[in-house]
Amino acid sequence: LGDVYKRQTQQGMEGKRKLTAKDAITAGALGAVCIAIRFIFMLVGGISPYVWFATHFIDAILIGPVFMLLVAKIRKNGPFLITSLVTGLILVSATWMFPITGLVGGILCELCLKAGQFRKKGWLVLGFFCFNLGFIGDFLPLWLTKESYLEYAAQMMDPGYMTTMEGLLTWPVFGIIVLSILVGSILGALLGMKLMRKHFVKAGLAQ
């Protein structure tokens, strides 16, 4: 009898760890928000290279509450990897590197969340940083394939825009972008946690 109870308990726990159809729908809906925010800021980046390079900092802050809500509602591995990969595939027209960085960022995010049992703040922040860093695929061609990218972009972009951008394509600037993503991730995660306590729990959106 004890063995039967143990097996049933283990099966129940395994069932709870598996993504359900409801989990997938929730992840899809909230993932769509992440994709929409990223797409909008990619368009806004056309104003200036400075604005474009700052967009990952801004969208990390805005996505923070969405990320934390998704963690609180599901508390299972899978949704962020799915969201990262789908985002990369949808935005692959911008660069083929998007799905690759999205996949890596999504995997690292899931590992961090699991390590923190979906509750520990430090791991949540680190996981969110990895999630956001996965979106950096739209910038990588500028540094890794600089000459060919600039030659291609020059056919469509304003000469003044191109001159400014070319002057920014140094590795120290890339390091600043990564640092800005880290800072934005911390601020976004903290904002998400604050909203979680203040509004989401009261509204019954999270536990």
Please give the residue ranges for each predicted region.
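Short, small-residue-biased leader/transition segments that mark boundaries at the very start
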Residues: 1-5
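Short, charged juxtamembrane terminal tails flanking transmembrane helices
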Residues: 12-14, 196-207
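Hydrophobic transmembrane alpha-helices
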Residues: 14-78
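Hydrophobic alpha-helical transmembrane segments
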Residues: 24-28, 57-58, 80-85, 99-103, ...
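Short helix-perturbing small/polar motifs within transmembrane alpha-helices
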Residues: 30, 36, 103-139, 189
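Membrane-water interface at transmembrane helix exits
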Residues: 37-42, 46, 71, 75, ...
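Alpha-helical membrane segments and adjacent membrane-interface helices in multi-pass membrane proteins
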Residues: 53-112
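Membrane-embedded alpha-helical hairpins and interfacial helices in multi-pass inner-membrane proteins
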Residues: 124-201
